[in-house]
Amino acid sequence: ATGMATGCASSGQESGKSKLVKIAVCVSDQTPAAKAMTDVFKPMVEEATNGKYDLQIYNSGVLGSEKVTYDYTKSGIVEVCVVGTSMWSETPKMAIPDFPFLFRDVEHARKSYQGELGTYIAQDLESTQPLKLLSWFPNGARAFSSNKKLESLDDFAGQKLRMPNNPIHVKLAESLGANVVIMD
């Protein structure tokens, strides 16, 4: 399972009387994380602040890749980002949620993120980066997609798989015998 984190920098642009808050979401607007941002987070913040903030959500990576939007958030170009594993290179503990078979199910992952594990990882991120971790989104189990049926471990041998630039995911696929093509 992969934890998706939302980070927040402190700068922003003014938009009329409301402060414009740009939120970069690298996944499709049809995913649970994007829907949570649009359907829950945005109205909750706007209502709780009486319109002080105008949250503009940019889904599907329109503001850039995870790494780009993470860097934008650190530099204040974007106020909030929803990203997966792009934070690892600078904060290695962010890799912990990516280990295979770490969580029994989504509820176990959620409790772990909201408990000691999530606090431990967030404190490390916040002590090394100019960010504040606002929330975790369990991203489900790792799945492999292929035009060829992958019904047994033998089916992975020589299978070309596109993978995110994530050493844990890549090593898992390679250990199954797949030929990995890294996507950035």
Set out the residue ranges of the language-model regions.
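Short, low-complexity disordered leader/linker segments with a strong preference
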Residues: 1-20
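Periplasmic binding protein-like
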Residues: 65-84
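Short helix-capping segments at alpha-helix termini
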Residues: 46-53
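Contiguous mixed-secondary-structure segments that line small-molecule binding/active-site clefts
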Residues: 39-46, 79, 84-183
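Second-shell loop/turn segments in exported
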Residues: 27-31, 57-60, 108-110, 158-159
